[in-house]
From Swiss-Prot:
The lineage of its organism: Bacteria, Bacillati, Actinomycetota, Actinomycetes, Streptosporangiales. GO terms for cellular component: small ribosomal subunit. Pfam families: Ribosomal_S4, S4. InterPro entries: Ribosomal_uS4 (IPR022801), Ribosomal_uS4_bac-type (IPR005709), Ribosomal_uS4_CS (IPR018079), Ribosomal_uS4_N (IPR001912), S4_RNA-bd (IPR002942), S4_RNA-bd_sf (IPR036986). Gene3D superfamilies: Ribosomal Protein S4 Delta 41, Chain A, domain 1, RNA-binding S4 domain. Keywords: Ribonucleoprotein, Ribosomal protein, RNA-binding, rRNA-binding. The gene is rpsD. Part of the 30S ribosomal subunit. Contacts protein S5. The interaction surface between S4 and S5 is involved in control of translational fidelity. This is Small ribosomal subunit protein uS4. It comes from Thermobifida fusca (strain YX). Residues 92-152 form the S4 RNA-binding domain. Transmembrane segments: none annotated.
Length: 203
C-alpha cells in the first residue's frame, strides 16, 4: 500500500526531504515527527538499517511494497549490479521521467498528470505511472492539456532543476522529453544506499 499522508511528515520520518516543498521544512525540523523526535535515536540492528533504507527508497518513488519487490526481482535478472539496475528501472518509470524533466513539482503531481491522461509516449496516451520508458522514446504533454496551468508552468521551466538529468533531452518550450540512454547510477541524484536495499531483499 502506498503512503498517502502528509509528505513533510514523511520526509522527517525518512530522514531526507522527499519533495521540493519539504526541503525548507526539513532544514528547520530535520528530526523525526512526534513528541520525542528531537531525542537521539537508539542504535539499531543491521536489519532495521536495511529496512529503513528500503522504506526511504519506496517513499521517494511513491511505491507500494509489492511494486518495490517487483523492481528488485526485475533488477536481479539484468546483467549489471542489482542495486544500480533497481535505480535505473525506478528512474525510467514514466512518473519519475516527468519529475526529472521538471514537468511536475513532485512525484505525486507527476502520477496525477499521468492518471488523468495528460501524457503521451510516442504519441499514444499512457495513463500508467509505472510505465517503463525506453531509450529512444519521446514523452510529451497532450496538445489539449497544454493550456492547463501546471503545464504552462512546466513550459516556463518553473519546476526544472538547474541541471537536467543527462540521460534526458528536454524541451520545456515544446513540452517534450526524449530518453536518450539508460540511467547510470552516478547520474541519479538520490540520497540512498541501494546496496542496503538489495541486502534487505536478499536476506
Amino acid at each position: 500500500m502506498r503512503y498517502t499522508g502528509p509528505k513533510v511528515r514523511l520526509s522527517r520520518r525518512a530522514g531526507v526531504p522527499l519533495t521540493r516543498k519539504a526541503v525548507k521544512y526539513f532544514e528547520k525540523r530535520p528530526y523525526p515527527p512526534g513528541e520525542h523526535g528531537r531525542r537521539v535515536r537508539r542504535s539499531t540492528s543491521d536489519y532495521a538499517v536495511r529496512q529503513a533504507e528500503k522504506q526511504k527508497l519506496r517513499w521517494y518513488y511513491d511505491l507500494s511494497e509489492k511494486q518495490l519487490a517487483r523492481v528488485y526481482e526485475n533488477a536481479k535478472k539484468r546483467p549489471g549490479r542489482t542495486g544500480e539496475e533497481m535505480i535505473a528501472e525506478l528512474e525510467l518509470r514514466l512518473a519519475t521521467v516527468l519529475l526529472r524533466a521538471g514537468f511536475a513539482a513532485s512525484i505525486y503531481a507527476a502520477r496525477q498528470f499521468i492518471n488523468h491522461g495528460h501524457i503521451t509516449v510516442d504519441g499514444k496516451k499512457v495513463d500508467i505511472p509505472s510505465y517503463q520508458v525506453k531509450p529512444g522514446q519521446i514523452v510529451s504533454v497532450r496538445e489539449k492539456s497544454r493550456k492547463l496551468v501546471p503545464f504552462i508552468e512546466a513550459a516556463e521551466g518553473v519546476h526544472a532543476d538547474e541541471k537536467i538529468a543527462s540521460y534526458l533531452a528536454v524541451s520545456h518550450k515544446d513540452l517534450t522529453i526524449a530518453v536518450v540512454d539508460r540511467p547510470k547510477r552516478e547520474q541519479v541524484p538520490v540520497p540512498f544506499d541501494e546496496q542496503l536495499v538489495v541486502e534487505y531483499y536478499a536476506r
